[in-house]
């Protein structure tokens, strides 16, 4: 279950669809993009991801993948199911080229890797996809008998067509010779200019003449130029021949239609099978578009597990990444973990600190993953499968139902509590907001308690202290903070799991220049204990960030030392192998020299 109906618009997946459509080669792939759907079947999701991963390798490692002629001829094929209908010349040309593309793709995917065991494929998932696809070599051969390499009907497509075109060529030649003779005489008499040549008007060969001299040439006036300075005369001597040309052209058209109709009649029983092959072409176009998009966003397949899990390292919101890249900026990556011990993450921190972006990143990437798209994160990341995803973000105000923002929020909570389970992922922004804080916080805590009891997974953003305390006191729920630099007074857009975040309300108020006496009054109203607790919280987060940085530095140094030690050990092993090899070869050479010396001594003794 995906909730609400406009879930894709809320997380930005509609924009992902549009970006994918732009990478398709044809309407075949574009339809697949629009039909792309979320799946909660582990095997299906893994197969889709593996297909895209393999195609990324094709894009990176191969330069001969057949991707030239992705034509959607399905409407034409469906049209000729009706008796008497036929494919025209262009449709037949598109059919041939796209059938050749299907054939070439199947051959490409079914090839074996010479470096591996016999029959093994470098692209096993795509090979399975191409396994039962019919490639219609006889159909292609028939079309080749009709069309030239450039898509024109061949002269020898039929005996009758060859005869018609021979007569056409002969008649045209005769007319041309007659016209040239008439033209030379007219030029010698000064009726037409020296540089004038015969031209075509309404399919008939004519001579351009000045209006004042048109009576000098006996014939039929067919047309005049837009300026009125030229008329086009068909000499009487070639009228009959031109009429014959028109007759032959009609015969040619009728014979071509007969040839195309005959071919379409032969094709008609196989149309259903041919259409199945075009479904394969559509799938390849779709997978290729997903692979191109994966390259654009540095997407990959994390280690996929058949359970509910988020263990992401350096995850990135792809739309934000593309947007910032245009301005030469980079996204701050997200590290997040949800598992059986910490299923629900409560994120707190200052406004505009990245809480909502964090929540949307989780929703978008998980939805992309289960829709068969590779996602941008570190390769050591792990991901699971959820049966349903719910989101509550933004203003869902309905004029028709006269619902306020908070009423809409509560309606969403009601649906989530009713429908969620241990395989669900819930995403809630500003949990409990939109009403009086005390009761809003209480209701939010009660709802959170139900979510936890149902063992659902989720990411929730909030400012409420009671929800932070709930996370500290209950198993399955964990706090997270969006980090903030107190000295620079700016958000760092980094998520740190383990401690709640501060809203930094006092610091932000002081930064924007609120009078100190107002800040002092506010501090007195809320109480020194709250202010001190918030400061202690900030100190804890700051210290944790400091020690986390130290830990990262130590880890990097340890990794560097391990790599150095491993490199030296490898070099020592290589030296030992080289030493043994040198000694072995030296021993063999000594033995060979001894054998040769003994042989020479024996030969010398025999000769004496």
What are the residue ranges of the model-derived segments?
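Extended, charged coiled-coil "arm/hinge" scaffolds of SMC/Rad50-like chromosome-maintenance ATPases
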Residues: 135-151, 240-261
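Terminal-proximal interaction/regulatory segments of ATP-powered molecular machines
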Residues: 547, 551-608
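Extended, Lys/Glu-rich alpha-helical coiled-coil stalks
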Residues: 60-67, 257, 264-268, 272, ...
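Long, charged, glycine-rich C-terminal linkers/tails
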Residues: 183-201, 291-314, 378, 478
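ATPase nucleotide-binding head domains, primarily ABC-like/P-loop NTPase cores
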Residues: 297, 305-541
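SMC-family hinge/dimerization module
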Residues: 196, 201-232, 242, 304-333
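Conserved amphipathic alpha-helical "coupling/scaffold" segments
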Residues: 1-160, 164, 270-273, 277-283, ...
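Extended, Lys/Arg-enriched charged tracts that mediate electrostatic binding to polyanionic substrates
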Residues: 162-213
